[in-house]
Amino acid sequence: MAMKKLLIASLLFSSATVYGAEGFVVKDIHFEGLQRVAVGAALLSMPVRPGDTVTDDDISNTIRALFATGNFEDVRVLRDGDTLLVQVKERPTIASITFSGNKSVKDDMLKQNLEASGVRVGESLDRTTIADIEKGLEDFYYSVGKYSASVKAVVTPLPRNRVDLKLVFQEGVSAKIQQINIVGNHAFSTDELISHFQLRDEVPWWNVVGDRKYQKQKLAGDLETLRSYYLDRGYARFNIDSTQVSLTPDKKGIYITVNITEGDQYKFSGVQVTGNLAGHSAEIEALTKVEPGELYNGAKVTRMENDIKKLLGRYGYAYPRVQSQPEINDSDKTVKLHVNVDAGNRYYVRKIRFEGNDTSKDAVLRREMRQMEGAWLGSDLVDQGKDRLNRLGFFETVDTDTQRVPGSPDQVDVVYKVKERNTGSFNFGIGYGTESGVSFQAGVQQDNWLGTGYAVGINGTKNDYQTYTELSVTNPYFTVDGVSLGGRVFYNDFDANDADLSDYTNKSYGTDITLGFPVNEYNTLRAGVGYVHNSLSNMQPQVAMWRYLNSMGQYPDNTNDRNSFSANDFTFNYGWTYNKLDRGFFPTEGSRVNLNGKVTIPGSDNEYYKATLDTATYVPIDNDHQWVVLGRTRFGYGDGIGGKEMPFYENFYAGGSSTVRGFQSNTIGPKAVYFPASSRHDDDDSYDNECKSTESAPCKSDDAVGGNAMAVASLELITPTPFISDKYANSVRTSVFWDMGTVWDTHWDSSAYAGYPDYSDPSNIRMSAGIAVQWMSPLGPLVFSYAQPFKKYDGDKAEQFQFNIGKTW
């Protein structure tokens, strides 16, 4: 025992004293202090084995090897005769990890970072690693301007050499920028330069992008913006000399000073293109032309490089290298641009694969492809395929990945990665207004039936005034060339009086068939035929209605409120669609134009034509497409042929969630003017117009009758949805809007009805403004809107809150 103490004391001064220069032969190895680590595992990590001759260097290597396992806080190696005694203190095992006070950083993100550093439940606690994590987290807070933040690791011992690890955060407040100074600017004012920054020392109320909270990453981005601003205006020698960020003593304020050297403005003297141009020199040189005396422009140089890469990509050169080097001549203030191009190998497509299409059949996606297998890779064709998949509306996201084929110098696989969305919707609508009360509608639509791409819909409405049923089917690829075939059958029993419209009842049924012919990538023409039977009854004597009947050779008695009429019509239906939206669901860029019309053909009782034109344009105002301006219009017009009028039941209506929000559906526009009917009883509650049997002159009502002309427009700002995580960002859309619209009757004779509103005047425009939220829920698209009408006319019916399932735009 005395010998062991002597050896321990000697170890503290010199290991050489213990083992000697020549070492000794180890006959046995004993461990002290092992709890969780097995003896066998500890022995395997040591470079020394029984029977080895051990020197001082071997002992040092043994200690290092044991520390390297990460299992021990302390290691001592002692000699007891011919036995090597290894004394260890194991690191405690982490039993639990908790967080407190963290608001800016979520628990899941913290756990991921800890696990990446090897800190997880069940592992040994490395205090050095914990200290590094503390510092790293504090550095993160400093980078986002929270200089008073602190992160402390609290380690609580538990039985059996275990510990609880708790990270306690004190995030503090973000330091706000007090002032931004730019020193050395002469050509542009400081205010002009700072106006392009994200970080600002003053943020007007209307600026939704500017931020006074300091962030290191944003400052780096702003400095790059400053550099680009000068380079794009000819300052080829522009330089940022230094940047100082000063913190106030209370760590709540930031002063930023940027020192710059503007230099002089330079002009292009020419562009020289060299290298492997793959036989496309003429096209590449056309992309690099500059005008004589044109100012040097850094953005144009970058655009040249990207355009050359895109050009070569269209011809199969998937990985070209394009480098530009400016040659600056300070004597005449010119820049000669040298562009070196290496087209590289030409690649061919071996396979096109799809991932994520669990429901949609492979053929549904493959028929949208413009890139062919076996052909050379065309980047524009790959992008067209992506755009076409997006426009289907079946997917939340579509991404492409071009993967080189191992072992092949000139082959790639093109992979389309899709995330499917619910293409079926249960269409259920509710509206509430002070005059209208509650209204309902319902239906089922499946745009990708059983993954085949067929659109199948069954829609129905059942309420106090309507029973409607419709079955529709569309095959978008009736032929291999992309000709579509669609058809529908419907039945409608409609009581207009109970719907607050002009008083009549119409029972109708019909069918139609339509073929769609793709003209090119973005244009489609449609043509088809249809049949409809209308059986009208209980028609009250109303001016516009009687005017139509007279044009049809029917001259009913003005005093009879039980008139009836029926018509069978055959129509030629036509249409045109231009669609260049970036995706079919929640688009953010591009435009869509939709023209639909019909005209009766020989054999019809009616003779008329009718057409509607819908447009929508999306313009992103930021690079991430989070802020988007949407403009929508809808125009409609119809009229009779050969002296006849368009049927009143084909009139246009406005108001409601798809036209002018804030107004009850179909209530904007002309109102019914009734003739007095002596056969109607004054106590008949089925009619609510103001005429009484004792009156002799026509009288107005609040019943909407629609018109043969319509114009609707909407301006909308789509914004990021607050309080929504990134997981649901693609499923929810928020916007503020301004709607306007009107409906008028071009045949209304204002001179004959001088005491009544002029329903032929198209300037009677209604307006509303509000907010809307759309959500692609498991049931289908949900649309909530709240709008306040601020321009309306007598007889209009407000409906501020509207809620629909199954309608998005």
UniProtKB/Swiss-Prot annotation:
Residues 679-698 are annotated as: Disordered. Keywords: Cell outer membrane, Membrane, Repeat, Signal, Transmembrane, Transmembrane beta strand. Residues 1-20 form the signal peptide. Pfam families: Omp85 (PF01103), POTRA (PF07244). Residues 679-693 have a biased composition (Basic and acidic residues). It is found in: Cell outer membrane. One of its GO terms (biological process) is protein insertion into membrane. GO terms for cellular component: Bam protein complex. Belongs to the BamA family. This is Outer membrane protein assembly factor BamA. HAMAP family: OM_assembly_BamA. PANTHER family: OUTER MEMBRANE PROTEIN ASSEMBLY FACTOR BAMA, SORTING AND ASSEMBLY MACHINERY SAMM50 PROTEIN FAMILY MEMBER. Part of the outer membrane protein assembly complex, which is involved in assembly and insertion of beta-barrel proteins into the outer membrane. Constitutes, with BamD, the core component of the assembly machinery. Its main location: membrane. It comes from the Bacteria. Part of the Bam complex, which is composed of the outer membrane protein BamA, and four lipoproteins BamB, BamC, BamD and BamE. InterPro entries: Bac_surfAg_D15, BamA/TamA_POTRA, D15-like, OM_assembly_BamA, POTRA. Residues 24-91, 92-172, 175-263, 266-344, 347-421 form the POTRA domain.
